[in-house]
A protein has these predicted regions:
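Beta-propeller blade termini
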Residues: 9-18, 62-80, 111-123
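Acidic carboxylate motifs that coordinate Ca2+ or other divalent cations, activating on Asp/Glu
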Residues: 21
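Extracytoplasmic low-complexity, Pro/Thr/Ser/Ala/Gly-rich segments
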Residues: 1-11
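Beta-propeller domains
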Residues: 33-51
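Hydrophobic beta-strand segments that make up the repeating blades of beta-propeller
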Residues: 26-30, 78-84, 123
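Short, surface-exposed beta-edge/turn micro-motifs
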Residues: 24-25, 40-41, 76-78, 90
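Acidic, small-residue rich beta-repeat scaffolds with periodic aromatic anchors
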Residues: 1, 85-155
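A short beta-strand motif characteristic of beta-propeller blades
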Residues: 2-4, 53-60, 101-106
């Protein structure tokens, strides 16, 4: 962490055994230099041997919205990061590892939260009504063990 902070502010870091090899790796959220908010520069993956790879760096004017989230599901480890560009919602980016290499899941960037409850993974959907304002409804996600990807339930 100290070496990374030399280059950019470290806003969040989750160290876990993401690839299941018994050693810890990390997903790290780095900020933009001299930012008064928590403007995100990128999300990086730190391998157990110290090598660092860019998981996603094409952010444009977004801030870290909340703490990052580590989720274990069906023997896999997932890293979720919520970002916001202002307004009433946020976007969640979702990452994991496959065959020892990090990857971004297909639903990444289209989710709004990612969490596990009662052995099911969920996202939320923003429902607005004039009477109650913004409400966030839990939406269960389907998981395909073969592709190691989540999908929305069929409508």
């Amino acid at each position: 962490k100290t070496a990374l902070e030399f280059y950019r502010p470290v806003y969040a870091m989750d160290c876990e055994d993401y690839d299941g090899d018994g050693e810890k790796e990390a997903f790290v959220v780095l900020g933009k230099k001299n930012s008064s908010s928590k403007a995100i520069q990128g999300i990086y993956y730190v391998y157990s041997d110290g090598w660092i790879g860019p998981a996603r760096t094409n952010f444009s004017s977004v801030d870290l919205f909340s703490n990052t989230n580590y989720v274990e599901y069906d023997g896999k480890s997932f890293f979720a990061c919520d970002v916001s560009g202002g307004g009433s919602g946020w976007v969640t980016y979702l990452f994991s590892t496959q065959n020892g290499i990090y990857y971004e899941l297909n639903l990444s960037g289209s989710l709004q939260s990612f969490f596990k409850k009662d052995d099911t993974c969920y996202t939320t959907k923003n429902v607005f009504s004039a009477q109650y304002g913004h409400q966030y409804v839990d939406v269960p996600l389907n998981y395909d063990k073969d592709t190691q990807e989540f999908s929305y339930p069929e409508s």
